Regions:
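Non-catalytic N-terminal regions of enzymes
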Residues: 1-141
Length: 141
């Protein structure tokens, strides 16, 4: 079996209505390079907490997208060319993956392009491309 197998993709929308405004990016954001920097974080659950299912994570994500509604929007440009976030409530891209490996079997995870390719799909990597989804969340079971 592959180290990690992606089994599905879903768009998770906010759990309730959100504002539909436009948010300008800060001057510091405007100087940033326009590409995603893949980052993966592993956390061991507390012994007293049951491991959440993909459905639990999707529900939690939909709830958190209400107060953080900009993350359910899309990058765009204003008529004068300034980069901004259009709060569209389109949702965040959620990828679900499975692996037979335990966290310990992954070994010491070192951030690299090769390791990120094991866990992060290639599409959705260009936040300025309006035809691609720009936010990825993963659930591993």
């Amino acid at each position: 079996m592959e180290k990690v197998k992606v089994v599905g993709f879903t768009m998770v929308k906010p759990a309730s209505p959100t504002p539909s405004n436009t948010i300008w990016l800060s001057n510091l954001d405007l100087f940033a390079t326009w590409y995603h920097v893949p980052a993966i974080y592993f956390f061991r659950p507390a012994a007293s907490i049951a491991t959440p299912s993909a459905a639990d994570l999707k529900l939690s994500l939909s709830r958190v997208l209400v107060p953080y509604y900009a993350f359910a929007g899309r990058f765009t440009s204003s008529p004068d060319g300034r980069r901004e976030i259009k709060c569209t409530a389109e949702g965040a891209y959620f990828a679900e993956a499975v692996s037979e490996l335990s966290l310990d079997e992954f070994g010491v995870y070192t951030p690299s392009v090769e390791n990120c390719r094991l866990l992060v799909p290639a599409h959705g990597s260009n936040p300025s491309d309006k035809n691609e989804k720009s936010t990825l969340f993963f659930s591993f079971s």
